[in-house]
From Swiss-Prot:
Annotated organism of origin: Shewanella sp. (strain ANA-3)
CC per GO annotation: cytoplasm; plasma membrane
Taxonomic classification: Bacteria, Pseudomonadati, Pseudomonadota, Gammaproteobacteria, Alteromonadales
Gene name tied to this protein: pyrD
Sample GO molecular function, one term: dihydroorotate dehydrogenase (quinone) activity
Membrane topology (UniProt): Peripheral membrane protein
Protein name, as recorded: Dihydroorotate dehydrogenase (quinone)
Length: 339
């Protein structure tokens, strides 16, 4: 009930202003009695993933809490993990406003945020400051002004700094809103990046005496052959996990709606079938050797179950969470427990 009232107010506001207000409010209330307005008890449904044990298989996707400011509040809601970021080595403002658009009839969102964040050093401070022991993945990317050919260096900088504080690290090469970024998903550029990250991971594991898994987040706008090539590269470089998928550049299911022609990545219900299809193809290519987090268009427990059936071990929500509220977490966990 509280979420429906809050949502009604928020949906009257500019989307980015509403987002910033929500994150600020959650930051202030995460460890206070006021978190009773959104906290919920969810019975454990433990799941093993990348050598880690999560309390349940439902996580918050990257992009909601870019700077890790409201981690404790999301823990109170019952998420099994939170993925913060995308974070870059240096702070950057992102793309020009407006850059976030609701397509309410389709339960969808278009964004062209452009990795706006306060930088990796600020994120590390927030990771240290969190009060709860929730599993936190850190999604890392490159700065907009770093040439793609040197992008590897940005990922290594971020990895080095977040490694001691992350449950796992997600490598984002699939956002459509950073020029040239998606080119890292192909051929020699991909192999070179994954190899460098794996080498760095093993160095950091020795240095910090703990092994932090790394996962690759991929786009939905890939051919079957491209997905197979990515799968082979992940296996070859001994990556620990994959996350499928990011937002799509297609506009299937939103034609004619207000804001449908805005540039950027489309998320939400129109992405449901495409992301599930990619998960299934990726799972085939990985052949059980590397586990997958399924994300994209999960608007109900049934959508999540389809991701599990396609080959995902865990799922993440974002747009569906905005449209449905925290109850979606509980619904998915309960359905998972019964499946």
């Amino acid at each position: 009930m509280f979420y429906k009232i809050a949502q009604k107010v928020m949906f009257q506001m500019d989307p980015e202003r509403a987002h910033n207000l929500a994150i600020g409010s959650l930051k202030m209330t995460g460890n206070s009695p006021l978190n009773a307005f959104y906290a919920q008890n969810i019975a454990p449904a433990p799941v093993s993933f990348m050598g880690l044990t999560f309390p349940n298989p439902v996580g918050l996707a990257a992009g909601m809490d870019k700077d890790g400011e409201s981690i404790d509040a999301f823990h109170a809601m019952g998420f099994g993990h939170v993925e913060v970021g995308t974070v870059t080595p240096r702070p950057q403002p992102g793309n020009d406003l407006p850059r976030l658009f609701r397509l309410k009839p389709a339960k969808a969102i278009i964004n062209r945020m452009g990795f706006n964040n306060k930088g990796v050093d600020n994120l590390v401070k927030n990771l240290i400051a969190k009060k709860t022991d929730i599993m936190v993945g850190v999604n890392i990317g490159k700065n907009k002004d770093t040439p793609v050919e040197q992008g590897k260096d940005d990922y290594l900088i971020c990895m080095d700094k977040v490694y001691p504080y992350a449950a796992y690290i997600a490598v984002n090469i699939s956002s459509p809103n950073t020029p040239g970024l998606r080119s890292l998903q192909y051929g020699d550029l991909l192999d070179e990046l994954l190899s460098a990250l794996k080498t760095k991971q093993l160095e950091l594991a020795e240095k910090h005496k703990k092994y932090v898994p790394i996962a690759l987040k991929i786009a939905p706008d890939l051919t079957t052959e491209e997905i197979e090539n990515i799968a082979q590269s992940l296996i070859k470089n001994k990556f620990d996990g994959a996350i499928a998928t990011n937002t799509t550049l297609t506009r299937d299911g939103v034609s004619g709606l207000a804001n449908a022609n805005e540039s950027g990545g489309l998320s939400g219900k129109p992405l449901t079938e495409l992301s599930t299809k990619v998960i299934k193809q990726l799972a085939t290519g990985l052949n059980g050797q590397i586990p997958i987090i399924g994300v994209g268009g999960i608007n109900s427990a049934e959508d999540a179950l389809a991701k599990f059936d396609a080959g995902a071990t865990m799922v993440q929500i974002y747009s569906g969470f905005i449209y449905q509220g925290p109850k979606l977490i509980k619904e998915i966990v309960e359905a998972y427990r019964l499946k």
